[in-house]
């Protein structure tokens, strides 16, 4: 019964189907489909027909899909769904269109739930069907993606694909193989239209498919090297989007074979792969990725060895130019590739060809302002670091390539340019001096680009970094001795700046521009300098304070003879404990010092503060102050040579500023003098006065008692006679031998002053020296009263004695004052302005000599302070031409006189002379060259006898010692003038005859 | 009188002999003198004897009992203290001289004869005897006896010798007969001594007169002394010279010539037979010596020299071993004298040669100094003086020598100074001063001469010096270093250190590095790469000639595209582009295009010189090619392009003045002239605008006036130029040309006018302002915008002030429609722009301060003000002038400081006002400082107004801050601030404090 029924149904089915060709509506009736599905279960014999029917259904659906031809040709997306949703006809035919869905659902459930044998069957059928349909209805060639999009919109195709997919999951290993076989067979048959299916389905067993595709490609390639591999490439390209790992694995596998060819086919592997890359960027990318991953030095050898084999392939031989551009198409690892090539370039010409070609192309593209994938690669963070590293390479090719790449990317990304400059500046080129070449070329920029970024922001960037570095101390612990980034940067900037000076060395950077750029950065440089130097200055001060404290303590214990050994011992103990820390500090300071030297060198090299640059006043002030601070810091350098070198640096610096700007000179000189007198006097032999700390006041001493000790009143702080503190004994006085200024440092200091004062363009300009002179008056003299030039009546010195003694005391405290006066004495008439100081010295000496008279039996020691002071004062007067000859020789003989006589001489010859001849510039004659000079040889300038005779008479009484001087001072000149006098020997003869 | 320091009388030693004992025992004197150390000494005896016998004519009143007192005192009287001797001559009262002794010598004196009493005579004899014991050594006498005593001795000598009382000085017409008591020989001796003393006294005249005067008794003696000293010396000289010339034998006293009186025996006078005869040589030597001294004293140096020589020869003539009785010349003294006269037999010292050379126009000075470098005898300071003197005399033209001499002397001094460790006169400027001369060789030469003679310690000094030299000599240091190495002074460590330091000075030479390559390395042999390299070179080269060569080379490679398209970024301005494109395809086309494109590229990179040179080459190339009619046109266009580039360069490098501004201005005028003349071809608008702005910056206004205003971008420059010209015409604070004002104002409209003119909005204004360079143009623009700001802000507290301000209208129609914000921003920008070109313009600094203050940025405002003040006074070297800081600015600064919480600073600033506004002062002082840079007591040293200090003292007292109060009080007590000081001092002290305060501010705000 059932059977009959079945047969009837079958008959009906066959009829319907055979007639149905003309009328799709009939075929797609759901009843019929159900019937067919029923057969599938009940009549296995009809399976073929049923499947045929299903195929028919699918075809109808496809036809329906294709017919309106409403697909967008580019994307493959049918326009219908979107735009023509309301199309009536479409709606009408919807059941037909959807008919295959029923089949699909049914078959799918069969696959899922039915016996496993269904799967291969259905899979094979579906594949066949899909292949057939695809081949039949593909009107024109589309890319794989487009095909996929196009076909998958079709419900039948989509259903079939889903089916195949479901089946594949159920397959066993051998079945799978078979399926793949079928698929590939299909692919062979319809290589043009089947590719999208392979690509689409390949995802199910990607590796296998990929491998097979490759194998199949290679076979075709071996057969005919001119063959087109679009499909293969297409499939691979498509699959790569999801299955790059498998592709890579496949490549890896193939390359392994390719590099070690066993089969004849293997020889073609490399050429084949390379050819394939021409078809697709993604494949290329993958291949490169693989290559870069597995690349080793050995492999390179292999490549070189095998290359002739590959080259025998004609296609490959001809494709080199295209290969050369390959790198431009890389999204990643492009830079790595190029650098790898560059590393080998020295060895292999082909690498150079490759490099040169690639780079040339690259630069051309940049000039044309075209965008390309490699740019993205270059802009990667990692690539940047890699390139920076390569810039430091010793391999010139590598370095060059890195620089060129950086230049290329900089044209589009200025920030990378700045970062690169900043980075390269921070590196040390002590080991590889070549490295600086990269920096220089980079600074040269990419020629031909109109809007290539300038390098100034790069400098600013690095300086900003360093400022932070210097300000926030040592963020990371660094092993001692390693050059810091700040150090490197400045040393590199220095090299650059020095190179520009020697013109011919660096054609890439215009000296002027570099200079300008660095000068623009001056505020930043100064900030760093400020930080560095100020820390060093603090260090000096601290050291000095400690040293004085030690010295004072020692002296005091010597004075009071009650050494507290215990206390000392404790002190030393502390010392040793502190040492490691101090070492670190020392080390830091040494680094800082080196940095300071470098910065000053740089400032000199870029001629900071010269007349040609426009500077704001605060900057001028800052530069000037820092220069002076640096000078004093330089004085604390360890060796003579370094001290001298540091000083010379600061001279150049000082001189440039001071001759450019008056205000700079003012500041420099003031700072120099102030610091020498008040802050860093200890460097220049200042008498050290230790400030007792309050805590040492004995506790039992009540405040009221202390108050009794110190007289109160307006002038209590002005008393000179502080030789000690009541209750604490005399002020410890250092032995006189230590009172001298260290000669070397003194000389350095004087040169610094001279550098500020000297005007190279107007050599006889004494403005600077006069300024020093006035400064000394301001700083040494106690107040503004009596600071005029004239010498008053000697009587009047009583009024000024107190301030005179304070001034004298200043000279005792700071011996360097003498030297400063000595310097300005040589530049007449500058010393005139210090008249008040000379007056004070003269007055105090005079008084002291007079005072000695009381105690006349006490002999005057040759090196007595008073005698030295008198001598120096006389020398100063002589040097500055404030007193004329023969008084100028007074300093030579003064020590032969007794105190009363000295007092007399000082008053009669010196004081009175100066009183009548006011030390003022008016004394001097200015010649055409602007030189101030007093011609003391002329008759006019002869000293009136009242100033000389006292000396002459005194000398006459000491002829036995002063005979020669007498002759030289008085007689020689006289006789020379009255030249007519006869030979004395003639007279002698007459006497003889008598 | 009760001086605790005065030594108390010491009890007499046992053996001390009292003076009267000698009167009693005539032998006592001989015995006494023969002792090894007689007490009292011979000199003391003389003094005592003389003080016992004052002038015979003298009248003095002795107090009763003074004799006794005298007896007690005199022995202790060890020195010539006349005050004590004062009461002595009690026995010599007139009555006594008349009555007591009458010890007249048997030889009857003439009526004027010796009218002495016995005691006087006895004492005189004793006195002369002692003097004879001392051999009449005038030196010794002079040294130990007061002048008055010497005169007395001399008088006594004469008196006794002539046998009659004489007064010193001897009268002019002195012709005393020798009385019976006298003796001719003795008289001659005495006269000789007299004349010698007369001359000698001249030498100590001053001193003698100043010597402490005897209090009362010796009044007359002093007068006598004066007379004696004033006696003319010529007769004495003549006398002594005669004496020298005469051959008459000369006798001197023997100790036994004088016979002391005995109490019992009247005696028969002196024993003049016992006298020494001395050789004339001895006499002459002594006399010549004295004469020489006298001549020296009176500056008759020639005579002195003769006398000294005579003295010496005479002394030499005396046979050695002879005992000299009369001549007391010590060899050292003689030598001194001879040396003083310059006739010493000793070899001339270096110093002497040196002095000689100075007098002889510096002959041989170099060799002397060279010698001295080794011997180091001449004081260094003298050498330095000579160096400077040579410089002076060469400079004034007195000395006809080359600078070479100066250089050599200086070099030798520098070398000498090496060993003057720490001399304060060392030459520190040698290298700078003589940097244009070849200053190193003389130095090295001098050094090499020195080197073998250096001690170890000196080598250290030498090292320091060499280091210094090396560091000085930038370029030549290598060579010097080689020389120095040759000296072998330095250890290897030191050499390394030096090398390290020198490294800094030498330019680095990059070898084998990228920087030394002219292009990228290209080893590839492929032709494509070659072509690529050529193209790259074409792109990067900066030289027209290279371009030409490369173009030829490239042409040969049969390129696929036109050569001018090699670099797409080459671009050519429009009129030229059409011209070039119209050319036939040729070398010239490529060449022109490439050069123009490259020039433009170079100009944008700031390489103006190469750009201009390229265009110049192109211009001449075009002229050479003689290409039809377009040559003229082309050249003209290129010239304008050149001008354009040069204007850009000039504006960019304004302060370096790269070009001849005059000619540039001329060319700008020409260029604008083309527009004016209505030529068929006019320059590009860009170029026209640049020209106009350039002329504005060159302050050449008239040519701008005649231009067509309609040309859009020219509008602003023209309006500015017109304003300037009107300002010149008006010469006064009159409102002028409103054109510029209106134009400027329109830029700040909230809603820019549409289409009214080609100019619109802030951006075009900025574009114009950006290219302003001249100070006055800046000033004008700033004042204009400043005025707009003032009107719009309408807040007199925050008014800006500047020059030119009064030129502009005082009101604006409908101010609401203008944007104050953009005015502020533009002004801020313009000020910083202007200050970046002229950072020392005080009025702008102040204005910026005003603006900052108006915005509320107090700190930056203060910075600007302080900057202005510091700049205006050259860091406080010049007094603060009114144009730098007037009351207006100071008040604003006070406001700033107060706003910043620095009330003390504000207080100090109040003193800067013309009239201190105590209201503000007290208000500020009572505020508590809220800024760590400010404190009440930090600025006491900057206050000069005493009222202010008083207030502070009071304030501290109120607050109970004792120590601060004391400090303030001590400030008030300084002499400088005394209200009674004269104006100058007051001004000075205020000035000092002002600058001190300003410097403090500068350190706080500017550093």
Swiss-Prot record, chain A:
Subcellular location: Nucleus membrane; Nucleus; Cytoplasm
Pfam entry (one): INTS5_N
Record's GO cellular component terms: cytoplasm; cytosol; INTAC complex; integrator complex; nuclear membrane; nucleus
Sorted UniProt keywords: Cytoplasm, Membrane, Nucleus, Transmembrane, Transmembrane helix
Membrane-crossing residue ranges in chain numbering: 769-786, 810-826
Record's keyword annotation contains Cytoplasm: yes
Recorded topology in the membrane: Multi-pass membrane protein
The keyword Electron transport belongs to this UniProt entry's keyword annotation: no
InterPro entries associated with the record: INTS5, INTS5_C, INTS5_N
Span list, region Disordered: 559-586
Cited function: Component of the integrator complex, a multiprotein complex that terminates RNA polymerase II (Pol II) transcription in the promoter-proximal region of genes. The integrator complex provides a quality checkpoint during transcription elongation by driving premature transcription termination of transcripts that are unfavorably configured for transcriptional elongation: the complex terminates transcription by (1) catalyzing dephosphorylation of the C-terminal domain (CTD) of Pol II subunit Polr2A/Rbp1 and Spt5, and (2) degrading the exiting nascent RNA transcript via endonuclease activity.
UniProt record similarity statement: Belongs to the Integrator subunit 5 family.
Name of this protein: Integrator complex subunit 5
Species this chain originates from: Drosophila melanogaster
Lineage: Eukaryota, Metazoa, Ecdysozoa, Arthropoda, Hexapoda
UniProt gene name: omd
Curated annotation (Swiss-Prot), chain B:
Residue numbers covered by motif WFEF motif: 19-24
Region feature (Disordered): 56-112
Regions of compositional bias (Low complexity) in chain numbering: 79-97
A GO cellular-component term linked to this record: chromosome
The UniProt record lists the keyword Chaperone: no
A biological-process GO annotation: protein localization to chromatin
Sorted UniProt keywords: Chromosome, Nucleus
Primary location recorded for the protein, binned into one broad class: nucleus
Disulfide bonds: none
Cited PANTHER family: INTEGRATOR COMPLEX SUBUNIT 8
Family as reported in the entry's similarity comment: Belongs to the Integrator subunit 8 family.
Function: Component of the integrator complex, a multiprotein complex that terminates RNA polymerase II (Pol II) transcription in the promoter-proximal region of genes. The integrator complex provides a quality checkpoint during transcription elongation by driving premature transcription termination of transcripts that are unfavorably configured for transcriptional elongation: the complex terminates transcription by (1) catalyzing dephosphorylation of the C-terminal domain (CTD) of Pol II subunit Polr2A/Rbp1 and Spt5, and (2) degrading the exiting nascent RNA transcript via endonuclease activity.
Subunit relationships: Belongs to the multiprotein complex Integrator, at least composed of IntS1, IntS2, IntS3, IntS4, omd/IntS5, IntS6, defl/IntS7, IntS8, IntS9, IntS10, IntS11, IntS12, asun/IntS13, IntS14 and IntS15. The core complex associates with protein phosphatase 2A subunits mts/PP2A and Pp2A-29B, to form the Integrator-PP2A (INTAC) complex.
Comment text on domains: The WFEF motif is required for the recruitment of protein phosphatase 2A (PP2A) to transcription pause-release checkpoint.
Protein name, entry field: Integrator complex subunit 8
Source lineage: Eukaryota, Metazoa, Ecdysozoa, Arthropoda, Hexapoda
């Amino acid at each position: 019964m059932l059977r009959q029924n079945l047969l009837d149904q079958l008959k009906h089915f066959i009829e319907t189907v055979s007639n149905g060709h003309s009328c799709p509506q009939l075929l797609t009736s759901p009843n019929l489909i159900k019937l067919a599905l029923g057969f599938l279960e009940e009549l296995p014999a009809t399976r073929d027909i049923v499947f045929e029917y299903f195929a028919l259904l699918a075809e109808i659906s496809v036809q329906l899909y294709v017919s309106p031809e409403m697909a967008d040709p580019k994307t493959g997306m049918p326009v219908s769904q979107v735009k023509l949703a309301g199309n009536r006809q479409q709606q009408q035919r919807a059941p037909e269109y959807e008919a295959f869905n029923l089949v699909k659902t049914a078959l799918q459930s069969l696959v899922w739930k039915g016996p496993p044998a269904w799967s291969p069957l259905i899979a094979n059928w579906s594949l066949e069907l899909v292949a057939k349909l695809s081949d039949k209805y593909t009107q024109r060639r589309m890319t794989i993606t487009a095909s996929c999009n196009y076909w998958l919109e079709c419900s039948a195709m989509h259903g079939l694909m889903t089916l195949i997919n479901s089946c594949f999951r159920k397959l066993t290993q051998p079945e799978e193989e078979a399926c793949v076989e079928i698929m590939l067979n299909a692919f062979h048959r319809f290589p043009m239209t089947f590719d999208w299916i392979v690509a689409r389905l390949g995802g199910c067993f990607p590796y296998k498919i990929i491998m097979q595709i490759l194998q199949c490609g290679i076979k075709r390639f071996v057969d005919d090297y001119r063959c087109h591999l679009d499909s293969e490439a297409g499939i691979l390209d498509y699959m790569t989007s999801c299955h790059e790992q498998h592709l890579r694995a496949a490549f890896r596998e193939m390359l392994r074979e390719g590099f070690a060819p066993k089969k004849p086919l293997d020889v073609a592997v490399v050429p084949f792969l390379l050819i394939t890359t021409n078809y697709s960027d993604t494949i290329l990318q993958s291949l490169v990725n693989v290559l870069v991953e597995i690349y080793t030095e050995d492999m390179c050898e292999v490549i070189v060895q095998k290359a002739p084999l590959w080259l025998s392939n004609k296609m490959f031989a001809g494709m080199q130019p295209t290969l050369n551009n390959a790198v431009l198409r890389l999204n990643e690892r492009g830079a790595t590739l190029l650098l790898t090539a560059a590393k080998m370039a020295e060895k292999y010409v082909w690498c150079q060809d490759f490099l040169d070609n690639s780079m040339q192309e690259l630069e051309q593209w940049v000039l044309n302002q075209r965008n390309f994938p490699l740019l993205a690669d270059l802009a990667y963070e990692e690539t940047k670091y890699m390139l920076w590293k390569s810039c430091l390479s010793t391999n010139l090719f590598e370095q060059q390539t890195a620089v060129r790449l950086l230049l290329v990317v900089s044209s589009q990304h200025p920030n990378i340019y700045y970062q690169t400059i900043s980075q390269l500046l921070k590196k040390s080129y002590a080991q590889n001096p070549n490295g600086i070449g990269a920096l220089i070329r980079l600074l040269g920029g990419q020629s031909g680009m109109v809007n290539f970024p300038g390098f100034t922001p790069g400098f600013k960037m690095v300086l900003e970094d360093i400022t932070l570095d210097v300000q926030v101390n040592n963020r990371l612990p660094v092993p001692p001795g390693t050059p810091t980034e700040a150090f490197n940067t400045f040393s590199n900037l220095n090299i650059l700046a020095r190179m520009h000076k020697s013109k011919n060395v660096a054609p890439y950077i215009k000296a002027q521009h570099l200079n300008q750029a660095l000068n623009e950065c001056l505020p930043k440089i100064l900030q760093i300098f400020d930080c560095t130097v100020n820390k060093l200055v603090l260090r000096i001060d601290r050291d000095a304070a400690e040293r004085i404290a030690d010295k004072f303590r020692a002296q005091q214990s010597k004075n009071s003879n009650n050494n507290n050994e215990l206390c000392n011992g404790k002190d030393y103990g502390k010392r040793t404990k502190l040492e490691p820390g101090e070492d670190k500090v020392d080390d830091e300071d040494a680094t800082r010092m080196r940095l300071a030297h470098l910065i000053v060198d740089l400032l000199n090299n870029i001629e900071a503060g010269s007349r040609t640059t426009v500077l704001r006043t605060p900057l001028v002030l800052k530069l000037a102050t820092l220069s002076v601070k640096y000078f004093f810091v330089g004085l604390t350098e360890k060796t003579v040579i370094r001290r001298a070198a540091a000083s010379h640096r600061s001279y150049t610096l000082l001189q440039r500023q001071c001759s450019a700007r008056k205000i700079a000179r003012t500041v420099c000189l003031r700072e120099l003098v102030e610091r020498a007198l008040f802050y860093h006097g200890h460097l220049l032999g200042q008498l050290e006065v230790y400030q007792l700390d309050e805590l040492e006041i004995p506790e039992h001493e009540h405040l009221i008692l202390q108050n009794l000790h110190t007289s109160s009143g307006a002038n209590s702080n002005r008393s000179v006679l502080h030789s000690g503190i009541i209750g604490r004994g005399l002020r410890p006085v250092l032995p006189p031998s230590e009172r001298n200024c260290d000669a070397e440092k003194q000389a350095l200091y004087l040169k610094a002053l001279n550098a500020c004062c000297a005007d190279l363009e107007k050599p006889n300009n004494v403005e600077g020296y006069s300024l020093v002179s006035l400064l000394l008056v301001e700083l040494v003299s106690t107040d503004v009263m009596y600071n005029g030039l004239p010498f008053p009546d000697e009587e009047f010195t009583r009024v000024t004695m107190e301030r005179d003694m304070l001034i004298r005391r200043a000279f005792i405290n700071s011996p360097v004052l003498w030297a400063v006066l000595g310097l300005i004495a040589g530049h007449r008439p500058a010393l005139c302005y210090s008249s008040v100081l000379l007056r004070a010295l003269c007055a105090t000496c005079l008084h002291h000599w007079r005072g000695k008279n009381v105690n006349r039996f006490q002999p005057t020691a040759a090196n007595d302070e008073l005698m030295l002071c008198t001598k120096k004062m006389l020398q100063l007067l002589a040097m500055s031409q404030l007193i004329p000859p023969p008084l100028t020789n007074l300093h030579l003989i003064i020590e032969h006189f007794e105190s009363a006589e000295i007092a007399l001489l000082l008053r009669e010859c010196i004081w009175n002379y100066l009183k009548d001849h006011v030390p003022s510039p008016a004394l001097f004659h200015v010649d055409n060259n602007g030189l101030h000079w007093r011609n003391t040889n002329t008759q006019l300038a002869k000293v009136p006898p009242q100033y000389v005779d006292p000396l002459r008479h005194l000398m006459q009484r000491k002829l036995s010692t002063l005979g020669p001087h007498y002759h030289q001072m008085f007689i020689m000149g006289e006789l020379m003038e009255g030249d007519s006098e006869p030979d004395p020997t003639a007279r002698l003869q007459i006497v003889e005859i008598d | 009188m009760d001086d605790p320091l005065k030594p108390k009388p010491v009890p007499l030693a046992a053996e001390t002999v009292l003076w009267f004992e000698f009167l009693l025992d005539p032998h006592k004197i001989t015995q006494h003198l023969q002792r090894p150390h007689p007490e009292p000494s011979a000199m003391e005896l003389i003094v005592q004897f003389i003080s016992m016998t004052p002038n015979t004519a003298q009248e003095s009143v002795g107090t009763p009992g003074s004799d006794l007192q005298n007896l007690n005192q005199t022995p202790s009287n060890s020195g010539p203290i006349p005050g004590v001797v004062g009461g002595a001559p009690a026995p010599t009262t007139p009555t006594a001289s008349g009555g007591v002794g009458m010890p007249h010598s048997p030889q009857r004196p003439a009526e004027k004869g010796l009218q002495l009493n016995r005691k006087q005579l006895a004492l005189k004899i004793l006195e002369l005897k002692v003097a004879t014991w001392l051999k009449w050594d005038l030196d010794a006498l002079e040294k130990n006896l007061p002048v008055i005593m010497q005169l007395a001795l001399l008088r006594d000598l004469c008196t006794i010798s002539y046998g009659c009382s004489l007064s010193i000085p001897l009268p002019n017409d002195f012709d005393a007969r020798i009385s019976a008591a006298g003796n001719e020989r003795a008289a001659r001796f005495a006269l000789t001594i007299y004349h010698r003393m007369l001359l000698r006294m001249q030498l100590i005249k001053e001193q003698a007169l100043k010597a402490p005067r005897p209090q009362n008794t010796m009044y007359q003696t002093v007068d006598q002394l004066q007379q004696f000293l004033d006696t003319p010396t010529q007769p004495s000289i003549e006398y002594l010279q005669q004496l020298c010339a005469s051959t008459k034998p000369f006798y001197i006293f023997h100790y036994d010539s004088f016979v002391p009186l005995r109490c019992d025996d009247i005696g028969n006078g002196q024993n003049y037979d016992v006298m020494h005869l001395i050789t004339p040589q001895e006499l002459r030597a002594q006399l010549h010596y004295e004469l020489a001294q006298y001549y020296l004293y009176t500056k008759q140096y020639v005579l002195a020299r003769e006398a000294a020589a005579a003295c010496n020869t005479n002394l030499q003539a005396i046979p050695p071993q002879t005992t000299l009785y009369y001549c007391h010349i010590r060899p050292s003294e003689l030598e001194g004298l001879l040396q003083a006269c310059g006739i010493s037999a000793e070899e001339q010292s270096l110093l002497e040669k040196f002095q000689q050379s100075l007098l002889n126009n510096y002959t041989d000075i170099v060799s002397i100094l060279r010698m001295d470098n080794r011997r180091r005898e001449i004081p260094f300071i003298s050498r330095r003086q000579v160096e400077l003197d040579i410089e002076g005399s060469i400079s004034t033209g007195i000395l006809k020598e080359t600078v070479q001499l100066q250089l050599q002397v200086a070099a030798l001094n520098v070398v000498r100074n090496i060993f003057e460790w720490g001399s304060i006169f060392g030459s520190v400027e040698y290298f700078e001063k003589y940097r244009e001369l070849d200053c190193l060789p003389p130095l090295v030469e001098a050094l090499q001469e020195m080197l073998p003679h250096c001690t170890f310690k000196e080598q250290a000094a030498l090292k320091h010096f060499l280091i210094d030299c090396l560091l000085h000599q930038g370029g030549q240091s290598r060579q010097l270093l080689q020389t120095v190495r040759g000296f072998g002074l330095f250890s290897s460590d030191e050499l390394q250190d030096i090398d390290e330091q020198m490294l800094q000075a030498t330019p680095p030479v990059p070898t084998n590095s990228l920087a030394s390559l002219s292009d990228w390395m290209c080893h590839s042999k492929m032709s494509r790469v070659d072509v690529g390299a050529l193209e790259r070179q074409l792109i990067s080269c900066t030289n027209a000639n290279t371009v030409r060569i490369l173009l030829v080379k490239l042409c040969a490679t049969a390129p696929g595209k036109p050569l001018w398209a090699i670099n797409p970024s080459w671009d050519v301005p429009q009129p030229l582009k059409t011209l070039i494109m119209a050319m036939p395809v040729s070398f010239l086309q490529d060449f022109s295009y490439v050069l123009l494109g490259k020039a433009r590229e170079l100009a944008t990179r700031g390489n103006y010189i190469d750009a201009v040179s390229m265009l110049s080459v192109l211009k001449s190339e075009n002229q050479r090619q003689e290409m039809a009619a377009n040559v003229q046109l082309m050249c003209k266009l290129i010239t304008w392009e050149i001008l354009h580039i040069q204007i850009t360069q000039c504006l960019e490098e304004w302060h370096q003045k790269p070009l001849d501004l005059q000619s540039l201005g001329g060319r700008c005028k020409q260029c604008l002239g083309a527009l004016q003349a209505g030529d068929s071809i006019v320059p590009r608008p860009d170029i026209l605008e640049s020209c106009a702005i350039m002329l504005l910056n060159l302050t050449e206004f008239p040519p701008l006036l005649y231009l067509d205003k309609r040309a859009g971008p020219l509008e602003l420059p023209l309006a500015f130029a017109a304003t300037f010209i009107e300002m010149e015409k008006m010469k006064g604070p009159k409102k002028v040309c409103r054109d510029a004002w209106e134009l400027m104002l329109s830029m700040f409209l909230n809603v820019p006018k549409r289409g009214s003119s080609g100019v619109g909005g802030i951006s075009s204004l900025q574009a114009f302002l950006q290219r302003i360079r001249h100070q006055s143009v800046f000033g004008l623009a700033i004042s204009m915008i400043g005025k707009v700001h003032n009107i719009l802000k309408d807040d007199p507290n925050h008014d800006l002030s500047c020059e030119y301000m009064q030129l502009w209208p005082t009101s604006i129609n409908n101010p609401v429609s203008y944007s104050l914000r953009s005015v502020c921003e533009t002004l801020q920008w313009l000020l910083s722009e202007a200050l970046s070109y002229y950072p020392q313009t005080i009025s702008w600094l102040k204005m910026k301060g005003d603006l900052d203050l108006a915005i509320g940025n107090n700190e930056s405002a203060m910075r600007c003000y302080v900057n202005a003040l510091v700049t205006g006074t050259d860091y406080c070297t010049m007094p603060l002038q009114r144009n730098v800081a007037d009351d207006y600015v100071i008040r604003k600064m006070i406001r700033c400081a107060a706003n910043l919480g620095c009330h003390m600073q504000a207080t100090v600033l109040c003193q800067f006002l013309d009239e201190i506004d105590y209201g503000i002062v007290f208000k500020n002082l009572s505020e508590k400082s809220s800024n760590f840079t400010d404190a009440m007591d930090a600025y006491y040293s900057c206050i000069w107004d005493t009222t202010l200090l008083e207030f502070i003292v009071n304030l501290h007292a109120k607050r109970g801050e004792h120590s601060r109060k004391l400090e303030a009080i001590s400030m008030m007590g300084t002499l400088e601030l005394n209200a009674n000081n004269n104006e100058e001092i007051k001004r000075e002290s205020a000035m000092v404090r002002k600058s001190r305060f300003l410097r403090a501010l500068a350190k706080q705000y500017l550093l």
